[in-house]
Amino acid sequence: MKQSTLLTVTSLLSILLLSLHLTSDFIHNAGELSLRGLFISVLILVVLLYGTLVLAERRSGHVIMLLGALAALGMPVIHLMTARGVAGAIDRPYAFIFVWALLCLGVTGLFSFFLSVQGLLGLKRGQQG
C-alpha cells in the first residue's frame, strides 16, 4: 500500500477515534459541555478532515495531519497526567471502551506521526530535485 494512502487511512481513523473520545468526554463530564466547546471541537475536526482529504498531497495537508497525529498521540498522555488519570474511569461501565480508545488513539497517532514526517521529508526532497 502506498504511504500516502496509509497516512490518509490512519489520519481518518485518528479523526474518528478523536471524535468518539470527545463525545465520551462530553457525555461523562456534562458540566464541561458548552456551545463554545462543541463549536471548537467541530472546527478542529473539520480542519483535520480537510487537511486529510483535500490537502493530502500538499505540505499544508501533511502539517495538518502531523498536528492531528500529535493530538491523537497526546490524548492518552493528557488523561494519564490528570489527577484522576485513567484510574478514575476504571470502575465505570464504559471503562473498557475508554481505555481501548486511548490505546488506539496512541497507536494511530504515533503511526500517523511517522508517516507525516516521512511524507514531509519526501515532499522536501521532491521539490529540491
Regions inferred by a protein language model and the residue ranges of each:
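Short juxtamembrane and helix-loop transition motifs at transmembrane-helix boundaries
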Residues: M1-L6, L22-S34
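C-terminal TM-helix exit segments that contain a strictly Trp-centered aromatic cap at the helix terminus
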Residues: L17-H28, L70-G85
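Hydrophobic, membrane-inserted alpha-helices
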Residues: I44-G51
